[in-house]
Curated annotation (Swiss-Prot):
Xref: InterPro entries: DNA_helicase_Holl-junc_RuvA_I, Hlx-hairpin-Hlx_DNA-bd_motif, NA-bd_OB-fold, RuvA, RuvA_2-like, RuvA_C, RuvA_C_sf
Gene3D superfamilies, A to Z: 5' to 3' exonuclease, C-terminal subdomain, DNA helicase RuvA subunit, C-terminal domain, Nucleic acid-binding proteins
CDD domains, A to Z: UBA_RuvA_C
Subcellular location: Cytoplasm
Name assigned to this protein: Holliday junction branch migration complex subunit RuvA
GO BP annotation list: DNA recombination; DNA repair
Protein family (similarity comment): Belongs to the RuvA family.
Annotated spans, Domain II: 63-141
Record region (Domain III): 153-205
Designated gene of the protein: ruvA
Gene Ontology cellular component terms for the protein in this record: cytoplasm; Holliday junction helicase complex; Holliday junction resolvase complex
Length: 205
């Protein structure tokens, strides 16, 4: 089991990043790959090594707490790695925990791949068991007020963001519905993803 991988970001795509560590490139699937930027600065990614008969993959996270919630979600029947990543990519960690504790199925079914049965299973399996997942400990990667001083998004960034949404499991009709709102903004890829997920989870679907 790998605890974490340190290295340099060599590639960022809709589903994963590639971290170069001593000449070896690690393909790591993450909730929102675009929070990572290619640079000469070494980073640390906390990892989860997922092994099944037909698949072996590394999943990566900014914090141990984020990884902990991912592993707890994997323990719920009906939720696989892709579904767990989609939930984490929303940036609504606190709301997810609150929804589980308050048995708010209507909020949980907003995530791709989560129907009423799975939402109910999440509540049954996780309610009262998330005390060690502290939302305040999460790095706030999804703040609507986050802005870079100089870098602004272009149409290329928007295209990348839409591909990332599709990779998370959102249907084309859902993606299309948020495009008009996104076209009003000039953001980075990461910021477009955050904005789109905020719109999707707040009813514009």
């Amino acid at each position: 089991m790998f605890e974490y991988v340190t290295g340099y970001v060599e590639y960022v795509g809709p589903e994963y990043v590639v971290i170069d560590h001593n000449g070896i490139g690690y393909q790591i699937f993450t909730p929102n790959p675009y929070v990572f930027q290619r640079s000469k600065q070494e980073i640390r990614v906390y990892t989860y090594h997922y092994v099944r008969e037909d698949i072996m993959a590394l999943y990566g996270f900014k914090t141990r707490e984020e990884r902990l919630l991912f592993t707890k979600l994997l323990g719920v029947s009906g939720i696989g790695p892709k579904g767990a990543l989609a939930i984490l990519a929303s940036g609504q960690t606190g709301q997810v925990v609150q929804a589980i504790e308050h048995e708010d199925e209507k909020f949980l079914v907003k995530f791709p791949g989560v129907g009423k049965k799975t939402a109910r299973q999440m509540i049954l399996d996780l309610k009262g068991k998330l005390a060690d997942v502290v939302p305040d400990a999460f790095v706030d990667l999804f703040s609507d007020t986050e802005r870079f001083d100089e870098k602004k998004g272009t149409s290329a960034e928007l295209d990348e963001a839409l591909e990332a949404l599709r990779a998370l499991g959102y249907a084309e009709r859902e993606v299309s519905r948020v495009v008009p709102e996104l076209l009003k903004e000039s953001l980075t890829t990461d910021q477009y993803i955050k904005k789109a997920l905020s719109l999707l989870l707040n009813g514009k679907r």
